[in-house]
């Protein structure tokens, strides 16, 4: 449901829009925390260490995904507010293509560099295998994270921050049950926790896609909307990259902290 942000009580509109957005950003951080809590309780200290050793990397990648997709939503919001719906739809298409490209590049780079990342973190040998399996599966789920974050970004661009939050809250709860199912019932260990996480992320993204395809007619792309434009791609990248990289800068301190903790925890 689109909402005009230029009509009505400004304070009320901002609060209604901002609160789900803030809570949603917090919820996205809970995937790894939930995994760690359940893994620690069921599988023990070494399994917990395997998940915890990679948490900063997971937050780093997630932060970049959130940032770049939020940036892609800014030009979409601009043209929605200007009531230039044709231009807005073309930007949605261009943003989708760029997001797909980012998914391929980021996933490939993270998977290829997975071993090197764990070596940089100084992950001990006794937890290395489980840590590798966990973070590799998380990396393979990057496209699902980008799917949710891009679709939620364009929903927020037309004033709807509530729908993405509802789906994210559902996915966070679902992640708990999937963790228990994959770890307790299927006996998949740390890998099961990662599979549960990316499955929950995928479902939240698919739910957003269903809402857009069924109810958000103003976002339905026609034949004339589905073409790449250099100007659109440049504007999207000029917004997306600067919002993605500052997030990386903030998360790097956590990465350094994780490395120090792992080193300090060695016997």
Q: Which functions belong to the PLM regions below?
A:
Residues 19, 35, 72, 113-114, ...:
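Hydrophobic/aromatic residues in alpha-helical transmembrane segments
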Residues 48-108, 145-164:
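Small-residue-rich hydrophobic transmembrane alpha-helices
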């Amino acid at each position: 449901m689109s909402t005009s942000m230029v009509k009505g009580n400004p304070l009320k509109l901002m609060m209604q829009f901002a609160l789900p957005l803030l809570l949603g950003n917090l919820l996205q951080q809970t995937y790894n925390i939930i995994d760690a809590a359940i893994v620690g309780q069921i599988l023990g200290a070494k399994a917990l260490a395997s998940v915890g050793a990679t948490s900063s990397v997971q937050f780093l990648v997630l932060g970049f995904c959130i940032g770049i997709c939020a940036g892609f939503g800014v030009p979409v919001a601009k043209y929605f507010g200007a009531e230039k719906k044709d231009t807005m739809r073309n930007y949605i298409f261009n943003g989708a293509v760029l997001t797909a490209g980012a998914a391929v590049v980021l996933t490939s780079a993270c998977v290829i560099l997975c071993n090197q990342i764990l070596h940089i973190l100084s992950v001990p040998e006794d937890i290395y295998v489980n840590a590798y399996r966990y973070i590799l599966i998380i990396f393979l789920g990057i496209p699902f994270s980008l799917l949710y974050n891009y679709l939620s970004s364009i929903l927020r661009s037309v004033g709807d921050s509530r729908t993405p939050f509802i789906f994210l809250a559902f996915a966070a709860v679902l992640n708990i049950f999937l963790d228990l199912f994959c770890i307790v019932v299927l006996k998949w260990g740390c890998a099961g926790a990662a599979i549960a996480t990316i499955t929950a992320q995928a479902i939240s993204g698919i739910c957003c896609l269903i809402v857009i395809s069924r109810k958000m007619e103003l976002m339905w792309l026609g034949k004339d909307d589905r073409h790449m434009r250099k100007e659109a791609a440049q504007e999207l990248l000029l917004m997306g990259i600067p919002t993605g990289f500052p997030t990386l800068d903030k998360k790097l301190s956590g990465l350094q902290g994780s490395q120090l903790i792992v080193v300090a925890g060695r016997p």
